[in-house]
A protein has these predicted regions:
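Small-residue (G/S/T/A) turn/hinge positions that recur once per unit in extracellular repeat modules
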Residues: 21, 48-51
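General beta-strand recognition
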Residues: 24, 52-54, 157
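Solvent-exposed alpha-helices and their adjacent loops that cap or buttress functional pockets
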Residues: 7-9, 15-17, 35-36, 46, ...
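Feature marks extracellular polysaccharide-active and adherence modules
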Residues: 18, 26, 45-47, 56, ...
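Basic (Lys/Arg-enriched) interaction patch that binds polyanionic ligands
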Residues: 36, 55-58
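Intrinsically disordered, low-complexity linker/loop segments enriched in Gly/Pro
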Residues: 1-41
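A structural signal for small-residue-enriched, beta-sheet-centric alpha/beta enzyme cores
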Residues: 59-177, 181-182
Length: 182
């Protein structure tokens, strides 16, 4: 939403996922308005290796239809995931396009794309090569750039750049279907 001069929005959360429980976390895409500032801090505690997680987060470049690509003041997001008390994942995004002069649309950032999707899979019994092949099939011909990383045992991070939120939300829904969740 629009903000008064200097205002900012915050989202903070801490979720504990018990033994033999599954958390599907998939909020609507974040769409920053021009001159907005958003800070998010989230901790997910997985009590054991039987605690399962699918996490999804989609960030738009701004309201592109209004010419507000990367016109926000600040987008800051910190995500920490612990499994059985051990920190296994940290994602710390800090985008301040106007402040630091970074070409957010350019090389090493959004690479000409407008949306960034992050998908995390933890303790879901997935095999890396099978997941990599499946993701490739889902995104074939969609015009996305993506990468999959195994960051711990049975723990994967998928990052996807696209030209719009639709391919990312569609992928999110296909992932939920694959995992047996609707």
């Amino acid at each position: 939403h629009q903000m008064n001069d200097g205002g900012e929005a915050k989202r903070e959360g801490h979720i504990t996922v018990g033994d033999d429980a599954t958390l599907y976390y998939a909020p609507l895409p974040v769409l920053p308005f021009a001159d907005s500032a958003f800070r998010s801090s989230f901790v997910i505690d997985l009590e054991s290796t039987t605690s399962r997680l699918f996490y999804s987060d989609v960030l738009a470049c701004g309201r592109a239809a209004r010419g507000e690509e990367f016109a926000y003041r600040l987008y800051e997001s910190r995500l920490r995931i612990k499994r059985a008390g051990e920190l296994i994942y940290v994602d710390n995004l800090h985008f301040a396009p106007a402040e630091d002069g970074t070409d957010m649309a350019g090389l090493t950032q959004y690479e000409g794309y407008s949306h960034l999707g992050t998908y995390l899979f933890v303790n879901l019994g997935l095999e890396e090569e099978e997941l990599r092949e499946w993701v490739g099939e889902q995104l074939e011909g969609v015009g996305c750039l993506y990468g999959l990383t195994c960051f711990n045992e049975d723990a994967y991070c998928l990052k996807v750049l696209s030209l719009g939120s639709e391919p990312l939300v569609d992928l999110q829904n296909r992932i939920k279907d694959k995992l047996g969740r609707t």
